[in-house]
């Protein structure tokens, strides 16, 4: 059976208005508004002096979610998911719920770095951890013995990586992969996908900021590149035809070894 694997990153949701992290040019630090990510996205800081500040940060991010909406790219992926049952697989490094709101059930998406609407709760030291869906509500950490946003922090193990690698290891010539809006900074999907290309997997990259080195590597491997945002690519008739021809068993594109 032909499969489509969609790997999405921050650029997939950016056009919906979901803010992304930026790098401060003067300090080189990664920031989200006034927050230093080393303080609010680091497991060691969370366990130290930044427990409450981290929850304030994620409360703001959670409150932002209902103010943004799925864009055309989310809706297109959801349309394919519904039109081609069992053929479309979603892997995302995003923690928002826009794919779910577009029509892809949460359980049918692998959230590689967690899910913003959930918290992990421990009622007392050593007790089993529970995952609670808090929706868009503000969390008061003092209401729990211990709690943490169900989001993977720097310095923390990511349980979903194992399942992600299992999926990528199964790629064959029957598969097509779209990598959309991924910076390849935390996870370099190029190194995971180039071996699959040699096995015949077709790969499309959607990224307006492909650098020269990446372009050389993509060209050498026969990776088709769309140098634009997610919305533009997923509304491009040629792009849509390539994907749908693949899913329907027609000739799509050839990969080089």
Pin down the residues of each PLM region.
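Conserved catalytic core of sirtuin-type NAD+-dependent deacylases
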Residues: 1-257
């Amino acid at each position: 059976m032909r499969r489509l694997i969609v790997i999405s990153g921050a650029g997939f949701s950016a056009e919906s208005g979901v803010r992304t992290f930026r790098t401060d040019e003067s300090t080189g630090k990664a920031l989200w508004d006034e927050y230093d990510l080393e303080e609010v996205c680091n497991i060691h800081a969370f366990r130290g002096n930044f427990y409450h500040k981290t929850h304030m940060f994620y409360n703001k991010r959670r409150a932002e979610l209902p103010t943004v909406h799925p864009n055309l790219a989310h809706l297109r992926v959801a349309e394919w998911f519904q039109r081609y049952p069992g053929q479309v697989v979603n892997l995302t490094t995003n923690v928002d719920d826009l794919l779910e709101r577009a029509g892809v059930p949460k359980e049918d998406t692998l959230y590689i770095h967690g899910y913003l609407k959930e918290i992990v709760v421990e009622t007392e030291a050593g007790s089993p951890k529970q995952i609670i869906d808090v929706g868009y509500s503000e969390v008061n950490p003092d209401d729990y013995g211990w709690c943490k946003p169900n989001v993977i922090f720097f310095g923390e193990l990511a349980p979903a990586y194992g399942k992600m690698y299992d999926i990528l290891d199964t790629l064959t010539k029957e598969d097509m992969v779209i990598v959309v809006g991924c910076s390849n900074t935390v996870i370099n999907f190029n190194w995971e996908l180039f071996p699959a290309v040699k096995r015949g997997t077709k790969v499309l990259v959607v990224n307006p900021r492909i650098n020269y080195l990446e372009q050389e590597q993509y060209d050498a491997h026969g990776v088709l590149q769309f140098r634009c945002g997610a919305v533009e690519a997923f509304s491009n008739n040629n792009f849509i035809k390539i994907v749908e021809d693949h899913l329907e068993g027609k000739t799509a594109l050839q990969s080089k070894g």
